Structure formats: C-alpha cells, structure tokens
Amino acid sequence: MALNLQDKQAIVAEVSEVAKGALSAVVADSRGVTVDKMTELRKAGREAGVYMRVVRNTLLRRVVEGTPFECLKDTFVGPTLIAYSMEHPGAAARLFKEFAKANAKFEVKAAAFEGELIPASQIDRLATLPTYEEAIARLMATMKEASAGKLVRTLAAVRDAKEAA
C-alpha cells in the first residue's frame, strides 16, 4: 500500500510520541505468523501496556533518531514489528519471549533499554526484570529475613552470656 507524505508524517509523529514516553523497545520479525496469532499478541499487548506497530524501516529510523532507542537502527531489516513498553520496562520483552515460545516463526531481533542495545540472545535480562510490586515484595522479604536473623543471633548471645555467668 502506497503512503503519501501526509500519511508518513502522521505515522512518524504518532510513533515518535509513543517512543518519548516508552521505557523500553523490542523489535521482532513476524513473517509467517498467522493473522489470528498476531491479533492475540496485539490483544495481550494492549492488556500489558505495550504499544505495537508494524512500521516501514525508513520511517522507524526517523522515529528513533535522537531517542534512547537509536541503538536499534541496525536491526531495522525486513518486516519490522516494534513494541514499546509503556508501564514496565520488561513488559514487551516478556510478551514477545512468551509468544516466540509458542510460535516458531516469530523471531525477536533485539531490544533497547536506557540507550543500551540488548541482543535477542540476552532478551531474558529485560524480560525477567521484576515489576515494581515484585521488587518491593522482594525488598520487604529481605528486610524481614535480615531482622529475624539478627533477633536470633541476639537471643543466642544473651543465652550464651547467661550460661557463662
């Protein structure tokens, strides 16, 4: 489908606006994946706060110019599906990783987080980032565990002191 200049400018403006507020971006190749599967992926993405769009590579290069996602430029080869995580940095990576397990033809190319290019082989680094709630829960568990251990050591020291006296 041919796009006129206004359509191209509108696409670049829309995706650029999304990129400004995004926490991370993941690029994938969806050749060979059925429309039904892609519809399921898009639905799951909307629920997870992930903006997804298939955009021409030349337009994507304009979109990422001057953003933390500029490191992705070299991955814009062939059909490109880009996903921006809007609420949690690992949301798009987690979504694409799970989808790729079930769909062999879906290939994650790379991701970008805080200006760093993350190759597809290391996408787990981004996908396994804990959510804010998970991080708080882990921190609280660690703090609780540390204070309980300290209490046990203190009680043991008191007991030892009484036995020595």
UniProtKB/Swiss-Prot annotation:
CDD domains: Ribosomal_L10
Domain of life, source organism: Bacteria
UniProt GO MF annotations: large ribosomal subunit rRNA binding; structural constituent of ribosome
Annotated GO CC locations: large ribosomal subunit
Record keyword RNA-binding present: yes
Membrane-spanning ranges: none
PROSITE patterns (UniProt xref): RIBOSOMAL_L10 (PS01109)
GO biological-process terms attached to the record: translation
InterPro entries found in the cross-reference section: Ribosomal_uL10 (IPR001790), Ribosomal_uL10-like_sf (IPR043141), Ribosomal_uL10_bac (IPR022973), Ribosomal_uL10_bac_type (IPR047865), Ribosomal_uL10_CS_bac (IPR002363)
Keyword annotations from UniProtKB, A to Z: Ribonucleoprotein, Ribosomal protein, RNA-binding, rRNA-binding
Family affiliation: Belongs to the universal ribosomal protein uL10 family.
UniProt cross-references to NCBIfam families, sorted A to Z: PRK00099.1-1 (NF000955)
PANTHER family registered for this protein in UniProt: 39S RIBOSOMAL PROTEIN L10, MITOCHONDRIAL
Subunit and interaction comment: Part of the ribosomal stalk of the 50S ribosomal subunit. The N-terminus interacts with L11 and the large rRNA to form the base of the stalk. The C-terminus forms an elongated spine to which L12 dimers bind in a sequential fashion forming a multimeric L10(L12)X complex.
Its job: Forms part of the ribosomal stalk, playing a central role in the interaction of the ribosome with GTP-bound translation factors.
Protein name per UniProt: Large ribosomal subunit protein uL10
Organism per entry: Citrobacter koseri (strain ATCC BAA-895 / CDC 4225-83 / SGSC4696)
Gene: rplJ
